[in-house]
């Protein structure tokens, strides 16, 4: 599942100007460690921009047309493929700056289309991916790449794989049931696994809410020990939005790595630090 911040960011991309029908895609649920996924497959969860090729054009998750160069999509298949437009780990801002342009430039040569699904094909996940693999055999220079799927033979493999990905600067892991036919919506057979970090900050300002949070707290503006300002708008219960902790309170929040500017990514409130 994409985070709220990322979704809003994508909706505001000025270059994705041409609307199409919103594609019916599959979405990830969150992995529960109590669930056995032995017999499933796992892959790295790439932090890029989702790109859905419907057989004729490249679209965002929300149905906006992505203005990719003609040379980039000239050898795309006549059938649908789904994946992430990606360059390298920890480069979401860089990817966005390339993809959002109305007039695409040469920086698109840094982009690959990392595919995790071939919709509407017969069989399980690996069978569907094999359809694309056969198509790419004579197209070795294609920007289309298939994300490698690793079999899960023992439960501990998921944790070790996640730790290895995070050490390399990756976002997380996706585990999927390879025997399931293609489906859309939020699936119990496709799960995201993330490893988060946490730290403390002091509340500097209480920001008012909008929409359903009108009259309540919308977010907290906090400062970390390193002097970094962080806006935290998720993770709160309704009662906490009605009665937010006062300015000067120290809270703990979780986040998923750092941006290039050193800001915590996707901060989520965890708890108020108890005075001991």
Q: Model-predicted segments: where are they?
A:
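Sec-dependent signal peptide recognition
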Residues: 2-10
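Intrinsically disordered, low-complexity boundary segments flanking structured domains
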Residues: 12, 27-30, 66-75, 81, ...
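N-terminal signal peptide c-region/cleavage motif recognized by signal peptidases
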Residues: 14-16
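Covalent nucleotidyltransferase
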Residues: 21, 32-141
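Nucleic-acid 5′ end/cap handling module spanning
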Residues: 22-61, 118, 145-263, 267-275
């Amino acid at each position: 599942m994409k985070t709220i911040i990322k979704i809003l960011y994508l909706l505001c991309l000025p270059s994705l100007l041409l609307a199409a029908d919103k594609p019916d895609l599959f979405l990830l649920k969150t992995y529960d460690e109590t669930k056995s996924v032995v017999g499933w497959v796992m892959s790295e969860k790439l932090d890029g921009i989702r790109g859905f090729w419907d057989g004729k054009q490249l679209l965002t998750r929300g149905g906006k047309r992505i203005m990719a160069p003609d040379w980039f999509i000239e050898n795309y298949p006549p059938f649908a493929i789904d994946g992430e437009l990606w360059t390298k780990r920890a480069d979401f801002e860089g990817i966005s700056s390339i993809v959002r342009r109305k007039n695409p430039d040469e920086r698109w040569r840094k982009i690959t289309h990392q595919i995790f699904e071939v919709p509407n094909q017969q069989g399980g996940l690996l069978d569907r991916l094999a359809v694309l693999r056969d198509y790419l055999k004579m197209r070795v220079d294609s920007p289309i790449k298939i994300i490698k799927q690793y079999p899960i033979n023992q439960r501990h493999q998921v944790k070790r794989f996640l730790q290895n990905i995070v050490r390399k600067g990756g976002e997380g892991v996706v585990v999927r049931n390879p025997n399931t036919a293609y489906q859309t919506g939020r699936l119990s057979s496709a799960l995201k696994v993330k490893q988060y970090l946490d730290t403390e900050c002091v509340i500097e300002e209480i920001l008012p809410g909008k929409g359903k949070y009108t009259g309540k707290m919308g977010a907290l503006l906090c400062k970390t020990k390193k002097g970094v300002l962080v806006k935290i708008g998720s993770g709160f219960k309704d009662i906490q939005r009605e009665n937010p902790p006062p300015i000067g309170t120290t809270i703990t929040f979780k986040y998923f790595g750092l941006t290039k500017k050193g800001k915590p990514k996707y901060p989520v409130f965890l708890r108020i630090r108890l005075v001991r």
